[in-house]
Amino acid sequence: MLAGGIIASKWFVKMEGTMNEQSIALKLDDVEFRRRRRVILTKVNLEVKKGEKWVLFGPNGIGKSTLVQMMSTRGFPSEGTVDILGNRLGKVNVFSYRNRIGLSSAELGRAFPPQEDPLDAIVTALTATTGRWRDTYTDEDYAKARSLMREFGIEYLEGKMMFKLSEGERTRVLICRALMADPDLLILDEPTTGLDLGGREIALRALSRVGAEQSDRAVILVTHRLEEIPQGFD
């Protein structure tokens, strides 16, 4: 158990060879986080090795989203250390490795320009940016993004604007984005939020394939609903 009632469970592990520092995807040592003198997290320790699938489970309001921010390089601890894919948070430019981290979260969803095309919101994961700026992407990049959209049943969203999407549609766009760059660390924060029954079934079926993967990718799924943990994580 982590701080504040967050339960960390390692549901699926596929590792080979000798365990060493090179096998660690994420490590939190004595992490604490305070906001305006309020203690949000205290003495959090967690080690996730490559190829492991973890579920962080607990009710809303106990610090799960704060943990997600730190694990995805978008927040810093008040005390303690966070090592992500061999990089010490705060010591290395996060943009040098952020595209190796796939993130789906409501907070990230609010970072896109309102008129962003969902297709661009997905493909820009390759450069870890939110918004089409000066970066260029290939036809193959867009083909992969469209393939992910089909897998999650949202191909019809191409050409629309992010601010016009429903919560469930935005959630599926963010999951596609998280998978776009074949990340070494995949973090899915409440990946079924806002989904209707049909969208939920499509998403859980696709995420079950992620859970069944035999690869070095580390996956962390954050949820407050046990019934929404995809197959392959149990």
Where are these regions (language model features)?
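The feature captures the beta-strand-to-loop junction immediately N-terminal to the Walker
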Residues: 57-59
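Helix-to-loop junction immediately C-terminal to a conserved catalytic motif
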Residues: 72
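Conserved ABC transporter NBD signature motif
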Residues: 80-90, 97
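ABC-family P-loop ATPase nucleotide-binding domains
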Residues: 108-164
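Conserved catalytic motifs of ABC-family nucleotide-binding domains
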Residues: 182
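Catalytic Walker B motif of ABC-type/P-loop ATPase nucleotide-binding domains
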Residues: 186-189
